[in-house]
Amino acid sequence: MAQDPRTWRWMRQNGHESRDEFHRWWEGVDLGFAHHLDGKLVGHTSFLNDRPEDRVVEIGNTWLHPSAWGTGANTEAKYLLLKHAIEDGGYLRVEFKTDAANERSRPALLGVGAQFEGIARKHMLVRGGQRRDSAWYAVIDDDWPAAKASLERRLGYGPP
């Protein structure tokens, strides 16, 4: 999983050369959530850039092995994190950032109910010393009821 270059295409890091390296990385994650499919670890996403004084948090550092693309694992993870942040945590805004050129992630973020807010040009340094333009998205508490209902229908939670 950690050695498939497609997994890491849009990430700052190059992946992990060994299980030990992966486990060292995992230990450094503040609050991470693993995606499992058929008992195998296939991805990760986490809260980051927590600003409780503003009631804003980001969901990111997301990677998913190609074997899990299109399975709904990422959609379900985003749903659970959004639900926890807004309903349990009282956050008013949940942010997402992705490489502006990431043609898989951008529609996926729209699919979880996030609104596109613009492009931050030369936003961050990535592998190879390149600068990345980042597409910014957010779900705010006002958006959440409609986004939640849509996600629950897609995921098969509750009545149709």
Regions found by a protein language model. Name each.
Residues E87-K97:
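Conserved GNAT acetyl-CoA-binding A-motif
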Residues M1-T71, H84-D88, G128-P160:
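GNAT-family acyltransferases
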Residues G60, T98-D99:
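Short His-Asn-centered micro-motif
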Residues K97, Q115-Q130:
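Conserved catalytic-core motifs of GNAT/GCN5-like acyltransferases
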Residues G70-A85, E103, P107:
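Conserved acetyl-CoA-binding loop-helix of GNAT-fold acetyltransferases
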Residues E17, A101-N102, L125-V126:
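Short secondary-structure capping/turn micro-motifs that flank functional sites
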Residues N102-G118:
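Conserved active-site alpha-helix within GNAT-family acetyltransferase domains
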Residues E58, E76, R93, R104, ...:
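Amphipathic alpha-helical recognition patches that constitute DNA-binding helices
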